[in-house]
């Protein structure tokens, strides 16, 4: 619990200061790049202070000079804070719509072109999210998404939602699969406690959705790539 309180203190304190100063500055400059870099530094600092070490491999697999869709498995609330600073380009994120209502943070996320997703929403809401994500890609940003849609209950890779793959086919952006492990033992689903440990991120070879006939085939290729790169105890039972 102490590690969680330390993490929250760093994020709330430094995040509020950065937001109060950085949001008006970014608005005047019409560029959120500096605020994004500061935010990633704050996230990395919080993770380190919580006793979490992040090991990253496979960055050579990330296409240079192209907007990508980074797709990772999802096992813990810690995943975004571990993953985002490791991505070697400025990214937008598909996230729960409710997070956009958080004071200061919500404003910063809107300025950063983060994409709200309405869980269990109607078809129109889903299409609006895909459109916003496509616009972010076209503007030169990459996208981070957890295609399972929610955290795995047992740490094993679960089924994928089709929405992110519709986005990939629509934009033809390369998909970079990411195998994430370690965070499932640091913060279990339903728990507020954080245990120190090592989080491992493995960036896998990019997958071009254009080489597949439909999004179902693309989905299977990405899911198989992630499954095969995960430790055996995290692999899905259907692979």
Segments from the language model and where they lie:
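Short acidic-hydrophobic, aromatic-tinged amphipathic segments that line or gate anion-handling sites
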Residues: 56, 115-117, 209
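Non-catalytic C-terminal accessory region of glycerolipid acyltransferases
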Residues: 5, 127-239
């Amino acid at each position: 619990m102490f590690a969680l309180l330390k993490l929250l203190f760093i994020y709330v304190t430094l995040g509020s200061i950065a937001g109060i100063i950085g949001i008006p500055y970014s608005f005047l400059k019409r560029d959120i790049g500096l605020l994004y870099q500061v935010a990633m530094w704050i996230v990395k600092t919080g993770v380190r202070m919580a006793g979490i070490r992040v090991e990253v491999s496979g960055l050579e697999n990330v296409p240079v000079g192209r907007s990508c869709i980074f797709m990772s498995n999802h096992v813990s609330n810690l995943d975004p804070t571990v993953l985002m600073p490791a991505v070697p380009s400025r990214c937008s994120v598909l996230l729960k719509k409710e997070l956009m209502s958080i004071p200061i943070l919500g404003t910063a996320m809107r300025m950063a072109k983060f994409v709200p997703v309405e869980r269990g929403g109607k078809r129109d809401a889903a299409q609006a999210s895909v459109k916003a994500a496509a616009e972010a890609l076209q503007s030169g940003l990459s996208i981070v998404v957890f295609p399972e849609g929610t955290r795995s209950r047992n740490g094993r890779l679960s089924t994928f939602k089709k929405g992110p793959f519709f986005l990939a086919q629509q934009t033809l952006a390369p998909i970079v699969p990411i195998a994430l492990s370690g965070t499932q033992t640091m913060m279990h689903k339903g728990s507020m406690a954080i245990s120190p440990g090592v989080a491992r991120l493995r960036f896998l070879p990019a997958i071009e959705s254009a080489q597949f006939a439909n999004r179902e085939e693309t989905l299977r290729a990405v899911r198989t790539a992630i499954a095969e790169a995960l430790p055996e105890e995290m692999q899905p039972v259907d692979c």
